[in-house]
Amino acid sequence: MSCSYYGKCAGCNLNLPYNDEISFKTDFLKSEFKEFYQGEIEIFKSDEWNFRNHAEFGIWHEKGDVFYTMRGNSNERVKIETCPKMDKKIVEMMPKLLQNLRENKNLKERLFGIEFIATKFDFMAILLYHKDIFNIKDDLAKLAEILDIKISARSRGKFLNFGGEILREKVQNFIYRFNADAFFQSNTKVNEKMILFVLNAVKNGKDLLEMYCGHGNFTLPLASEFGKILANEISKNSIKNARENSKNKDNINFVRMSAKELIDAFNGVREFNRLKDIDITDFDFSHVLVDPPRAGIEPEVLDFIQNFKNIIYISCNPASLKQNLQILCETHKITKFALFDQFVHTEHIECGVVLQK
């Protein structure tokens, strides 16, 4: 592995040639899920380097100087200058930003972390402080001007933005906007492959229910495959961005509701003002798409989605996926299984599973 920090920094824990790494992950999935699926696993590889568009680094203070750090294998902090996994824009910006911080006492004082976000259109550095950021407002504004990037500063629930707080990314032919604190895929190329996998999983689509939709990562491309889409998300900012992202699509309905609230609405347990303009009885669902957090799908949601003929499940945690499949495979059969290698040089695995009754 061509990184001088491997073995010291805990950011990577697999030191294998890339094809061997893919074999390691594939063999793990075959063994872990053999009771549910014995077919071929579709493999979607990543670039080995410069694939990550989003990361946070610690800041270490020593004798008036500052350094980037990562957590070490023994929980100590490891000084680093760069990270070869990062997008090239981040790699280029890291030393420039650090030099400007070193030259400005106000900016480096009580700074404890920096988060970088690089998209095809925007670049943002988020500076994390243990002090009143309003006292360094002018310094931050000047920093954004010098580096010609978006700068955000945060401390104790307060924040300042210079250059705008919205980021834009192009995935396939779609433009997505999102806030810096929203969840978004950190490997854009593999995300595009995930979207293609989902698109190819749709046959004879009528209407789609999408749960945990975020800012519409899958929703926008899927709009052309279905008559109508109903998509839920609990995050207010994500729903706001999803609606903005889909303003040219007239067959998508986004609702800010939890999965359990949406199920209550379908079951007639409660009426929700948020659904007053949407007739949920007017949908003819052929598919449900779920992309839950690491904890997986809640029991009541599992019971609910078993009513659908076709389930598309995107998982960021094989352990919770396996638990959920114990239930789903009582009524459904897996027809496709995919490995998305979002995080190269780590044991992290993301999966896509298609189930049918």
From Swiss-Prot:
GO-annotated biological processes: methylation; tRNA processing
Residues the entry annotates as binding S-adenosyl-L-methionine: 185, 212, 217, 233, 291
S-adenosyl-L-methionine is among the record's keywords: yes
UniProt KW keywords: Methyltransferase, S-adenosyl-L-methionine, Transferase, tRNA processing
PROSITE patterns cross-referenced by the UniProt entry: SAM_MT_RNA_M5U (PS51687), TRMA_1 (PS01230)
Catalytic activity from the UniProt record: uridine(54) in tRNA + S-adenosyl-L-methionine = 5-methyluridine(54) in tRNA + S-adenosyl-L-homocysteine + H(+); uridine(341) in tmRNA + S-adenosyl-L-methionine = 5-methyluridine(341) in tmRNA + S-adenosyl-L-homocysteine + H(+)
EC number: 2.1.1.-, 2.1.1.35
A molecular function GO annotation: tRNA binding
GO cellular component assignments: cytosol
Domain of life of the organism encoding this protein: Bacteria
Role according to the record: Dual-specificity methyltransferase that catalyzes the formation of 5-methyluridine at position 54 (m5U54) in all tRNAs, and that of position 341 (m5U341) in tmRNA (transfer-mRNA).
Protein name: tRNA/tmRNA (uracil-C(5))-methyltransferase
